[in-house]
């Protein structure tokens, strides 16, 4: 498997990845950022997995059930066949709360004959740090580790527990189930209860997708991407994760491996900007409440990222005992970027606040809190916009005056002005308008490079950067402006490699990037569309989505040479950009 051919299942509490052959290779319980119970994804030998071994006579295919996040893996031979339905339960209960327990259900449905299989159940708790022992009990199989950390995992099944635990051959004469739970169940699961969980979860996802608008072009891609973004939302707090994994490398064998199971203000704000346009306003409201909860008073500084349970310190650690995906070390947990200064987050957040308040001016319970946050951000931007920062790409060395950061400082003030006008709160209006113009003049004077005929990565630099393409999307410049058109063409010429974009080409902390950052190619395609090159944009879009995996899922990066998917998976950035680009191209049609 060389293309991250995994399906994601989840319930907005945690998620799991199932390979195209039905092996559960990544799962963290009880929550997204908990220690793994299966991590074959990060160490083929030590990580642990949950698979079905059926022999070479079977062909295996995998799809999602209808427009849902229930994954179906079908095993077929001439004599027998069966289907595995993998999902994490999620549905609304009678009291209107959501049932989303930390458990994975694997429902086996016999469709022909009497299939034979061996169950390879090999959990490795706590990132496989110590030995995990398996014990057969009366009602369940329990996995236990108590060396470095104490943890347990409970497996319930309608099949012989002894045959499962010892990986003995099993003949399927009827449908069967596995329920793997972080908690010991008070009421034992049965085939009836499993079927009920399946039907309720199926109904939940069909209802969710039914409330998503349909598009004439690329509808299935938009739907799958929207569902993926929903899976990356954490219902308990409203946080939105950058991805479901840690340490999948941007380049095989190199060290750009990061833990993405956190909530970046930038990434999450971009997600809700798009998902709100699809009518899913609950995610937007939950996320903005997450931000409000993080800033309880006016002196609280906004970090670039947080833990999904609002943690503010995300200490980075290295798991030296794991070999890494395709032997790409290190495997990291935590992320040291939480302490960085990135000035672009302010504008991206206030843009989302403005979008929400325009939509729901008279139906937003927290509009006073959002107005307070807006004023606080405007004050911070006014004090600090002239200072350098680490930029959108989180350079770990020196600070610079990044063009994208400056543009988003302008966005912060521009949207603050619009919000003040919306509520007729005009006491700061003149001061903000003066500041808005000062930032804009500064960018136009210092970010434009006459020799390159483009807005460049940072002031005084000749380096080009894909993030500058967003100047138009955020309203800083018109798509018909000759300087923007020239910038788009310069970036296309300088940063494109076989139709895929570099974020930038100048060497960073780890040398020259050797893979394409997927969202950047979407940004470029979007820009081509905006400047009138619609057919070229459509051609490049259809080529790019061809690099997604068998289920239409995308990771953070694509290798320039092999076109294999790299980086954490599935990636919110990639899927939000896919939606935005697909919608814009659909409108252009």
Question: Language-model segments: which ranges?
Answer:
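Acidic, mature catalytic/reactive cores of soluble proteins
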Residues: 1-589
């Amino acid at each position: 498997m060389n293309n991250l051919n995994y399906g994601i299942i989840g319930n907005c509490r945690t998620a799991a990845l199932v390979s195209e052959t039905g092996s559960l290779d990544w799962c963290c319980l009880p929550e997204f950022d908990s220690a793994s119970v299966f991590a074959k994804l990060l160490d083929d030998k030590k990580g642990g997995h949950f698979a079905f071994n059926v022999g070479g006579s079977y062909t295996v295919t995998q799809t999602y059930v209808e427009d849902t996040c229930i994954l179906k893996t079908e095993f077929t031979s001439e004599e027998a066949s069966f289907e595995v339905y993998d999902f994490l339960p999620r549905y609304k209960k009678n009291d209107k709360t959501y049932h989303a327990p930390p458990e994975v259900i694997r429902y086996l449905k016999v469709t022909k004959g009497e299939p034979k299989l061996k169950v390879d159940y090999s959990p490795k708790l706590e990132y496989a740090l110590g030995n995990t022992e398996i014990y057969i009990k009366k009602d369940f199989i329990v996995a236990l580790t108590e060396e470095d950390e104490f943890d347990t995992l409970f497996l319930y099944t309608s099949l012989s527990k002894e045959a499962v635990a010892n990986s003995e051959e099993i003949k399927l004469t009827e449908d069967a189930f596995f329920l793997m739970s972080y908690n010991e169940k008070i009421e034992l699961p049965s085939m009836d209860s499993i079927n009920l969980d399946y039907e309720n979860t199926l109904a939940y996802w069909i209802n969710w997708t039914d409330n998503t608008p349909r598009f004439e072009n690329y509808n299935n891609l938009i739907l799958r991407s929207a569902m993926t973004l929903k899976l990356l939302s954490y219902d308990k707090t409203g946080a939105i994760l950058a991805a479901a994994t840690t340490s999948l490398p941007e380049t095989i064998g190199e060290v750009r491996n990061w833990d993405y199971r956190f909530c970046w203000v930038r990434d999450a704000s971009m997600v809700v900007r798009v998902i709100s346009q699809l009518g899913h306003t609950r995610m937007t409201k939950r996320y903005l409440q997450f931000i409000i909860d993080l800033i309880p008073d006016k002196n609280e500084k906004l970090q670039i990222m947080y833990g999904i349970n609002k943690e503010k310190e995300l200490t980075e650690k290295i798991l030296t005992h794991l070999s890494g995906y395709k032997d790409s070390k290190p495997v990291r947990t935590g992320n040291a970027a939480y302490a960085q200064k990135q000035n672009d987050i302010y504008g991206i957040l206030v843009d989302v606040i403005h979008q929400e308040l325009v939509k729901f001016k008279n139906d937003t319970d927290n509009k006073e809190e959002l107005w307070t946050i807006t004023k606080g951000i405007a004050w911070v931007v006014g004090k600090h916009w002239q200072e350098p920062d680490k930029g959108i790409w989180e350079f770990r060395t020196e600070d610079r005056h990044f063009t994208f950061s400056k543009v988003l400082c302008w966005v912060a003030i521009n949207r603050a002005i619009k919000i003040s006008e919306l509520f007729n709160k005009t006491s700061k209006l003149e001061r903000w308008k003066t500041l808005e113009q000062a930032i804009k003049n500064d960018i136009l004077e210092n970010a434009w490079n006459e020799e390159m005929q483009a807005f460049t990565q940072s002031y005084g630099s000749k380096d080009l950067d894909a993030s500058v393409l967003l100047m138009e999307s955020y309203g800083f410049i018109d798509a018909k402006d000759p300087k923007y058109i020239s910038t788009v063409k310069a970036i296309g010429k300088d940063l494109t490699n076989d139709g895929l974009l570099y974020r930038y080409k100048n060497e960073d902390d780890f040398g020259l990037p050797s893979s394409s950052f997927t969202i950047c190619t979407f940004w470029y395609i979007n820009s081509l569309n905006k400047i009138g090159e619609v057919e070229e944009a459509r051609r490049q879009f259809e080529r790019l989505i061809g690099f997604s995996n068998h289920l239409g899922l995308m990771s953070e990066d694509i290798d320039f040479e092999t076109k294999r998917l790299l980086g954490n998976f599935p990636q919110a950035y990639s899927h939000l950009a896919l939606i935005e680009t697909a919608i814009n191209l659909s409108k252009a049609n």
